[in-house]
């Protein structure tokens, strides 16, 4: 397992897995190289790295980029929603954290984590109590407060 997590050997394993997948698939059907395949996936735009003009254009196009959720890392609601829409994202607090960094700043999520939970719940169309930190065994909330609300 440690070898698979090594950054230095990652490319070797990716190639071996790809070659093995081709051999397995070729047993069942013809396999051909796709000449139009682009191995580079465009990343999620990073608001804090944009100049003022680019930032203004993103906000004009998508107002969610103007709503800062994580003040420490300058992460917008738009970036979090883009992470949730990504093919690579796990819709958990840690999944979003690994993709766009809310909760990685000096407050360690003390300010933004409740907002991230709300955004995930809204995006998935589930109650706050259904949002998980990292897995099905890691709930964020356990039930309603005395007022009857589940708060994140």
Outline where the language-model segments fall:
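Short, charged, surface-exposed loops that flank catalytic or proteolytic processing sites
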Residues: 86-94
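Flexible, glycine/charged-enriched surface loops at secondary-structure junctions
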Residues: 30-37, 93-94, 128-131
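An active-site-proximal "capping" alpha-helix that borders the catalytic cofactor pocket
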Residues: 14-28
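Local cysteine-cluster metal-coordination motifs and their immediate loop/turn environment
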Residues: 66-80, 98-117
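Low-complexity, small/polar and acidic-rich linker and loop segments
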Residues: 125-151
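FAD-binding beta-loop-beta segment adjacent to the flavin cofactor pocket
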Residues: 1, 48-54, 59-63, 67-74, ...
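Active-site-proximal substrate-binding core of FAD-dependent oxidoreductases
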Residues: 24-63
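Single conserved hydrophobic/aromatic residue that forms the stacking wall/gate
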Residues: 2-9, 13
């Amino acid at each position: 397992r440690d070898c698979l997590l090594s950054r230095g050997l990652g490319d070797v394993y990716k190639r071996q897995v790809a070659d093995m997948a081709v051999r397995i698939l070729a047993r069942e059907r013809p396999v051909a190289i796709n000449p139009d395949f682009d191995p580079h996936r465009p990343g999620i735009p990073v608001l804090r790295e944009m100049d003022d003009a680019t930032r203004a254009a993103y906000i004009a196009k998508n107002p969610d980029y103007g709503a800062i959720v994580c003040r420490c890392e300058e992460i917008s609601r738009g970036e979090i929603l883009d992470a949730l829409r990504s093919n690579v994202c796990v819709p958990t607090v840690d999944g979003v954290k690994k993709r766009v960094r809310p909760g990685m700043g000096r407050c360690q999520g003390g300010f933004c984590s409740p907002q991230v939970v709300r955004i995930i719940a809204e995006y998935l169309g589930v109650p706050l109590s259904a949002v998980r930190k990292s897995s099905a065994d890691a709930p964020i909330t356990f039930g309603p407060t005395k007022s009857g609300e589940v708060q994140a």
